[in-house]
């Protein structure tokens, strides 16, 4: 997930523990008419309490999209945000020429922590790391490969895009004290938090049918974190609880429908088995009927029956002669 305001781009790397030893790339963003991308290489070992993160700023698809001889000179800063204390964030700044031979620059590693208490001291929270980059393009050789971003506007101390002004104004009109306890001063981080808040509000205004269980779980984690940095979000918490309850009702309804279908199938199977059992019983009784008759006849009666049969046979023989 990544959000951009002017020359600042914020990237939240989720599920870091599952990305061990992999190259992780952000989405492409545009600064100074140039396309950029962040690249990270995480190393996480919970058993040993070890966290390492290398981060680079790079030019995406430079060989395919840019003309021969292209290069660009940029000054940039990379920040690994401490989500519990802004003052502990790790910041590195430099300037460099990006070209075909050196399309990426960064700091290996920016973060290298061992035996840090409280889940890596605020750098890794809910298995997420937040990285911010600010880029100032000094000089470009070759054509620009993307349009400029719109200028930002200031709303209650937060820098937002013109397209976000209406949404942010609506937030402060409906909830004037929403940021009354938000004390972070760094403008890049303030912008990043506002972007997260707008995304959270948008997510929680979906209908129960549109939003997934995973989205709700992520929203719950994000909401708790946003409250921890000073935002007053009781209204969003209420909305989240309502969505959880409606999703539960929806899940219960689906589960009951499934049970009813299974019960219907079982009843049909029982009915078929009862019919088969009745048929088998009828066949067994029919096969046993002659034996049941002779079982109920005593010896005298049996002698009489045999004599009658023999007499009948003799008479039939006599008649035939």
UniProtKB/Swiss-Prot annotation:
UniProt KW Coiled coil keyword: yes
Swiss-Prot/TrEMBL keywords: Coiled coil
Coiled coil listed as a keyword: yes
Domain of life of the native organism: Eukaryota
Limits of the MATH domain: 6-135
Pfam families associated with the record: MATH_2 (PF22486)
CDD domains xref list: MATH
PROSITE patterns: MATH
Coiled coil start-end: 232-283
Protein's UniProt name: MATH domain and coiled-coil domain-containing protein At3g58260
Protein species of origin: Arabidopsis thaliana
